[in-house]
């Protein structure tokens, strides 16, 4: 049986979440007349989606193992036995709401120093909600809570830890960079911040199809 991640090519490669980093550094090098066009292009890219595969770990936490731009957002959960299923929109929204409550009361792993603290269900890793918000999909689905994570230094570090490995994170960055507007046309790109909430605030949350520094050692 073919797994969903082997059929990623079926989805249009159009996202562009790494463009969030670019938009924050558009400065004097950009022509004033080009800015409206650039902003429009970025806005359209951000409002697209991401195909994300989350893998269950032995401690019942979850990690991002694959992530690609997509015409719509799909989140696939793979359990310890290798079984996969696509989260429904209702499941995703419930998980994000639960994680938002943790962010509000300071117990979310995403904002804990050194990835510490949090609830007992996330004793040594990230739960589904925090893994989703740490991924590219989180910048789309959780855009309305971006202000709560924006410029949070702990989030900047922990967001990358939601990825299974540095290689998984780099594949994601490369994938989204390829689908984003070219850096040369926007005065270059900054790599000073990590996490998809790190440099801009998406303003809308598109429909879900039912279907960054330092890693854990």
UniProtKB/Swiss-Prot annotation:
User: Which chain positions have N-palmitoyl cysteine-type lipid attachment?
Assistant: 28
Q: Where in the cell is it found?
A: Cell membrane
Q: Which GO terms describe its cellular component?
A: plasma membrane
Q: Where is the composition biased (Polar residues)?
A: 160-171
> Is the Cell membrane keyword given for this protein?
yes
In what way does this protein cross or attach to the membrane? Answer: Lipid-anchor
The UniProt regions of compositional bias labelled Low complexity, in chain numbering, are 172-210
Q: InterPro entries, alphabetically?
A: UPF0323
Keywords for this entry? Answer: Cell membrane, Lipoprotein, Membrane, Palmitate, Signal
Segments carrying the region annotation (Disordered) are 160-217
Signal peptide as annotated in the record:
1-27
Q: Where is the lipid attached (S-diacylglycerol cysteine)?
A: 28
- Family according to the record: Belongs to the UPF0323 family.
The protein's name is: UPF0323 lipoprotein HPSH_01205
From what organism does this protein derive?
A: Helicobacter pylori (strain Shi470)
